Swiss-Prot record:
Annotated region (Mediates interaction with TBC1D31), positions in chain: 549-569
Name under which the protein is recorded: E3 ubiquitin-protein ligase Praja-2
Segments of skewed composition (Basic and acidic residues): 1-10, 246-276, 381-391
Subunit structure: Binds ubiquitin-conjugating enzymes (E2s). In vitro, interacts with the ubiquitin-conjugating enzyme, UBE2D2. The phosphorylated form interacts with PRKAR1A, PRKAR2A and PRKAR2B. Binds the catalytic subunits of cAMP-dependent protein kinase. Interacts with MFHAS1. Interacts with TBC1D31; the interaction is direct and recruits PJA2 to centrosomes.
Species: Rattus norvegicus (Rat)
N-acetylserine sites (modified residues): S2
Biased composition (Polar residues): 109-119, 482-491
Gene name of the record: Pja2
Pathway participation: Protein modification; protein ubiquitination
GO BP field: inflammatory response; innate immune response; long-term memory; positive regulation of JNK cascade; positive regulation of p38MAPK cascade; positive regulation of toll-like receptor 2 signaling pathway; proteasome-mediated ubiquitin-dependent protein catabolic process; protein ubiquitination
């Protein structure tokens, strides 16, 4: 039934503004107090929608549920008597009574009114309640009880509570002394008006319009209300009994209240909610039925945890297709700000999901430009994400709860990536799909098993993941997800495992071959190890891997290969580290050999031209009898042929004349045995003191060859 009485102290000082009077046992109550330093200006009521729209409302249309926290008891010393009724309006009062209208909150309101002597009831007096109870008994609907916990409305003439908060005007002149004033209802040809506090309601065929800033005061109408109730009660009951009988019996003991144009106007300090409330204006709210629900258990919980009793409404709203179209006009900046909170709300629903990380572009609403494709949470449909986003935006969530939710989210992500440690085949992305790859899928190569007897072991290391949303040209706009760094734990090396090597110096390479990226030539299977971690002699390894080591030049000191190319297979990185060490060892060996060669040249100066020309020459015959058993020149490795000129050194080694002449011009030694050949110009004393044996031995040899 429509409730025409509310309790509100007209005069409240600064101290009493933070409290309100005791909650009625079964009815709605007027709330005057502070919420985050703001004030609740007034509480108004609206009638419900028509029977046709009520049936649509039961079909599952949008509802807005307003859950009010408990409020503290009011300091009754500062309360004043009831405001007077506006004298300009007619003194007649219309009390509409249908089959669905029963005194649901009458006893509770009367009880709370009697406990507060400073506030007088206007509508729910004993006479009016007796009249309404008698009207209800005539329609055999006395089985409906006043439920203190839940009071839902779904009838033609019932009303809903509107809690209007002045949260955006800190300097607002709506002082805390604004009280609810019950004014007369004017009956003008089927039109009934009533003024409640700062709001005037025009009741015409079950519709309500609210006009603010009207504060009339007229004498009390308790007597007129009783007379008007008796007068119009029977007529209205007869008019509405036939149409509403079915709905009354279906509702049972639970009352549902809704309004044709009822919408909860709620202002918050959040800029996002301000934009949403601006679009959901009264013009667009004609098709949105309201649903008011009071939960005493919820209020009891908040009453025990809140030191200062405030009103914290929580609106749970099911977003319809029309409202989704209205929200498409929001700018991108607001959508980006809400993206993180939307994802966290979606994670709570999809926390236990383990579906494959594929989400289709067709299912994604292009109006929102932020989307997260974490594999275990990627199956969130756009409508579900929108529903959770609306819950997160409109709900008055405490900061402690928000921090706990953030911690739970990041912990879930960390546990997921730590547990997801097995190899998976990379999935192909078809048209209209995005592939949210895992850290292993961003590797340049797949983890193939080696062809050797011993299988590869995955080495621990750091993987820096850069998941990016890839889509075709027809897909909507997307943003790259922020980099997430996943660190692996370093474990001790076991037998047969390759050590993880990193280099701390700049690479210098003379390779001028191809400039392909590292992930294109990464072939871990081409790298073989035997049982002792030794490289097998496979000459095709270096040929197959067309490595351009200049790609790794310029890295900062202390930056290893693993950090530089985090998306490459760790096995390939290990191979590159070993290859680098081998290259360094080879360069060291070559440098040592070059130093040795220089020392030899210094110790053995080149032979003189006269000494070279004085060497004996031998003509090679067909049977090679002149040169003995030698078949080829040791310098050029060419076989001796007939009529070639061979030269014999003092050590009895034969060479081609041109070959040995070039050699002796660089070093005065035999290319085969390194025996000293007499130098070109040398001091006799130095020669006699330093190398007497070397000079004597060739002489003896020549003496022996002469006979």
């Amino acid at each position: 039934m429509s409730q025409y009485t509310e309790k509100e102290p007209s005069v409240m000082d600064q101290d009493s503004s933070k409290a309100a009077w005791p909650r009625a046992a079964g009815g709605y109550q007027t709330i005057t107090g502070r919420r985050y330093g703001r004030r609740h200006a007034y509480v108004s009521f609206k009638p419900c929608m028509t029977r046709h729209e009520r049936s649509l409302g039961r079909a599952g249309d949008d509802y807005e549920v307003l859950e009010l926290d408990d409020v503290a008891k009011e300091n009754t010393a500062g309360s004043s008597s009831l405001d007077q009724v506006h004298p300009s309006l007619p003194s007649e009062t219309t009390v509409e009574k249908s089959e669905t209208e029963i005194p649901t909150c009458g006893p509770a309101l009367n009880q709370s009114t009697e406990s507060n002597p400073s506030v007088a009831t206007v509508c729910h007096s004993e006479e009016v309640r007796e009249t309404l109870d008698s009207s209800t008994n005539l329609q055999n609907h006395a089985e409906r009880e006043c439920t203190p916990a839940v009071c839902n409305a779904s009838s033609v003439q019932n009303g809903i509570v509107l809690v209007h908060t002045d949260s955006y005007d800190p300097d607002s002149k709506h002082d805390e002394n604004d009280s609810l004033q019950l004014c007369a209802q004017a009956v003008e040809g089927g039109r009934r008006q009533k003024v409640l506090g700062n709001a005037v309601f025009e009741l015409e065929n079950g519709e309500v319009e609210r006009y603010a800033d009207l504060c009339p005061s007229v004498p009390s109408l308790s007597g007129e209300i009783r007379e008007e109730s008796e007068e119009l009660g029977s007529a209205l009951l007869e008019k509405n009994s036939a149409g509403d009988a079915e709905a009354v019996h279906q509702d049972g003991q639970e009352f549902q209240r809704s309004s044709e144009d009822g919408i909860v106007r709620k202002r918050r300090q959040d800029d996002t909610d301000q934009g949403r409330q601006t679009e959901n204006s009264t013009e667009d709210a004609d098709c949105v039925p309201g649903h008011v629900e009071q939960n005493t258990s919820e209020r009891a919980n908040h009453h025990g945890s809140s030191p200062e009793q405030v009103v914290r409404p929580k609106v749970r709203k099911v977003i319809s297709s029309s409202q989704v179209d209205q929200e498409s006009g929001f700018n991108r900046h607001e959508a980006k700000q809400r993206s993180v909170q939307r994802w966290r709300e979606a994670l709570e629903v999809e926390e236990c999901s383990s579906d494959d990380p594929i989400i289709k572009c067709d299912d994604y609403d292009g109006d929102h430009d932020c989307m997260f494709l974490t594999p275990s949470y990627s199956r969130v449909t756009p409508r579900e994400a929108e529903r959770h986003r609306a819950t997160a935006e409109n709900g008055a969530t405490a900061s402690g709860r928000q921090e706990a939710r953030e911690n739970a989210f990041w912990n879930a992500c960390g546990e997921y990536y730590q547990l997801f440690d097995k190899d998976e085949d990379s999935s192909e992305c078809s048209d209209g799909e995005w592939s949210a790859s895992l850290p292993h899928r961003f590797s340049g190569t797949e983890k193939d098993q080696s062809s050797s007897d011993e299988s590869w072991e995955t080495l621990p290391g750091k993987d820096e993941n850069e998941p990016e949303l890839q889509s075709d040209s027809s897909g909507p706009e997307e943003e790259n997800q922020e980099l997430s760094l996943q660190e692996g734990e370093q474990t001790s090396l076991e037998e047969g495992e390759i050590p993880w090597l990193q280099y701390n110096e700049v690479n210098e390479s003379s390779s001028d071959e191809g400039n392909e990226p590292a992930n294109e030539f990464a072939q871990p299977e081409a790298f073989m190890l035997d049982g002792n971690n030794n490289l097998e002699d496979d000459s095709s390894v270096s040929e197959d891997l067309d490595v351009d080591w200049s790609l790794f030049d310029g890295f900062a000191d202390g930056l290893g290969v693993a950090e530089a190319i985090s998306y490459v297979d760790p096995q390939f990185l290990t191979y590159m580290a070993l290859e680098e060490r081998l290259a360094q060892a080879m360069e060291t060996a070559l440098a040592h050999l070059e130093s040795l060669a220089v020392d030899v040249e210094v110790a053995n100066p080149p032979a003189s031209k006269e000494s070279i020309d004085g060497l004996p020459e031998t003509l090679v015959l067909e049977d090679h009898t002149a040169i003995g058993q030698e078949q080829c020149c040791p310098i050029c490795c060419s076989e001796y042929i007939k009529d070639d000129i061979a030269t014999e050194l003092p050590c009895h080694h034969f060479f081609h004349k041109p070959c040995v002449s070039i050699w002796l011009q660089k070093s005065g030694t035999c290319p085969v045995c390194r025996r000293h050949f007499p130098p070109a110009v040398i001091d006799a004393s130095a020669a006699a003191s330093s190398e007497p044996d070397l000079d004597a031995s060739p002489a003896n040899d020549n003496a022996e060859e002469a006979p």
